[in-house]
Curated annotation (Swiss-Prot):
It is found in: Cytoplasm. Its main location: cytoplasm. This is Small ribosomal subunit protein uS13. One of its GO terms (biological process) is translation. Belongs to the universal ribosomal protein uS13 family. It comes from the Eukaryota. The keyword Electron transport does not apply. GO terms for cellular component: cytoplasm; ribonucleoprotein complex; ribosome. Pfam families: Ribosomal_S13. Located at the top of the head of the 40S subunit, it contacts several helices of the 18S rRNA.
């Protein structure tokens, strides 16, 4: 149960996975500040770690935070299903994993480079700076391109 008076051990800002997390928010919503962790995954992690969802992030003990970060680091060991993870069947390793913060950025960049290197349709669209997912581009998405006709004086 959340208390009205903050204890002496309350942390206003927590450092989790190289991200500053607001200690005043409830733990489930505070964890969503970390890239790669959404509300559903955060909720599941809190339940697996047996942490009270109504508790503020700054009120969590070091043991509770350690348990949650352990689950985020290795979710398959805690019986989180493969379809719930954000990296499924990795191209290099074939493994399923949950990527967070800097790992996510690195893997996304590598994926785009791989698509460009194999010269597939998606890779070429990324290379040219065009829409990738089949959207029409005749009239929309013109920002940042060449300027139109200049008016005569």
């Amino acid at each position: 149960m959340g208390s009205l008076v903050q204890g002496d051990d309350f942390q206003h800002i927590l450092r989790l996975l190289n991200t500053n997390v607001d200690g005043k928010n409830k733990i489930m919503y505070a964890m969503t500040a970390i890239r790669g962790i959404g509300r559903r995954f955060s909720n599941l992690v809190c339940k697996k770690a047996e942490v009270d969802l109504r508790k503020a992030a700054g009120e969590c003990s070091a043991d509770e935070l350690e348990r949650m970060m352990g689950i985020v680091a290795n979710p398959r060991a805690y019986k989180i299903p493969d379809w719930f993870l954000n990296r499924q069947k990795d191209h290099k390793t074939g493994r399923f994993s949950q990527l967070t913060s800097s790992q996510l950025d690195t893997v996304m960049r590598d994926d785009l480079e791989r698509l460009k290197k194999i010269r597939g349709h998606r890779g070429l669209r990324h290379y040219w700076g065009l829409r990738v997912r089949g959207q029409h581009t005749k009239t929309t998405g013109r920002a940042g391109k060449t300027v139109g006709v200049a008016k005569k004086k």
